[in-house]
Amino acid sequence: MEIRYTPKELTKLPRTVEYKNKSVYMINQRLLPKEFKVEKFSKVEEVAEAIKNMTVRGAPAIGAAAGFGLALYAETSKAKTKEEFLDGFEKAYEILKNTRPTAVNLFWALNRIKKLVEEHSEDPLDEIKRLIVQEAYKIADEDVEANLRMGHYGAEVLPEGNILTHCNAGSLATVHLGTVGSVVRVMHKDGSLKLLWLDETRPVLQGARLSAWEYSYDGLNVKLIADNAAAFVMQQGFVDAIIVGADRIVANGDFANKIGTYMLAVLAREHGIPFFAVAPLSSIDMELKSGKDIPIEERSPEEVLTCGGCRIAPDVPVYNPAFDVTPHKYLTGIITDRGVVWPPFKRNLKKLFEVNKSGGDEAV
């Protein structure tokens, strides 16, 4: 696989999450598409609340945000001793960990930095602080590199034509470029993307508010549909492939993604349409054996009872799962930053991690 484009050649958008001058800066995605605003967060608690209330969302983006939250703690802590600093670090870690339960990148990023701190606990305090900040930057930069690789891998296997996607797995869901976002941007540059169908993605409308905004901003040919129009669009032969993100992929290939993904997978099988998930290795949780083990976040009833701040339903009971789990049998392949994984997923995901540990680069 050859990297043909740089991030700047693929998108005009800035990074979704950044850290500078002892503050975390994030695009406020709750305001889009009405207003584009980068907000400053100067406390760990503020970063945690931004993750919880979906000011920042998307598994890789919240992982990077959490990492920068620990960097923020490291640079603003008033602890006078190493013991006091490490106690405060543990509290900051717990605050950030307890924000959202489904996306594995959050825990991956936090645990990566925590492990580093444990390994260097005998180092001078200033060195521990420096290592925390350095690692947070590495996590963010590696995400951009991974997305760039996934974009080029995905463009090699997806058919030319019309692609349908769900929710927002674009640049806004990551540090930059996106998982799905990188794939469709590379296809757009190559000329192989004819049309990008976007599900509106109720109840928070990430497809309508975020994907439609960011992809049209970068000049892609997009068309928005209601979620319940997807089956008809497939039936009419208007979709050549479906590509979605993944907040957590487990050892057998089952994966959690935005609510409504499972429905699309079943429809894709019925209509003979290739169905791909795109995610970096950091979104793959080999500790969980099947999708039944993935914790599913439930969110506020107000997300369903209201739309754009306006009440659209009476005050009735609501069930509002934020994610669903798609069984691996519906997957054509998993596009990762180390190549494309094909069935059988249980065997080939295991092989992917073995190859990656040995320094290899190609999936199977």
Swiss-Prot record:
Pfam families: IF-2B
Protein's UniProt keywords contain Amino-acid biosynthesis: yes
GO biological process: L-methionine salvage from methylthioadenosine
Lineage: superkingdom: Archaea
Catalytic activity, reaction form: 5-(methylsulfanyl)-alpha-D-ribose 1-phosphate = 5-(methylsulfanyl)-D-ribulose 1-phosphate
Residues that, per the record, bind substrate: R57, G58, A59, R100, Q206, N257, K258
EC code: 5.3.1.23
Catalytic residue positions: D247
GO MF annotations in UniProt: S-methyl-5-thioribose-1-phosphate isomerase activity
Transmembrane segment boundaries: none
Site positions for Transition state stabilizer: C167
HAMAP family xrefs: Salvage_MtnA
Similarity comment: Belongs to the eIF-2B alpha/beta/delta subunits family. MtnA subfamily.
NCBIfam families noted in UniProt: eIF-2B_rel, PRK05720.1, salvage_mtnA
UniProt function note: Catalyzes the interconversion of methylthioribose-1-phosphate (MTR-1-P) into methylthioribulose-1-phosphate (MTRu-1-P).
The name this protein goes by in its record: Putative methylthioribose-1-phosphate isomerase
Organism: Pyrococcus horikoshii (strain ATCC 700860 / DSM 12428 / JCM 9974 / NBRC 100139 / OT-3)
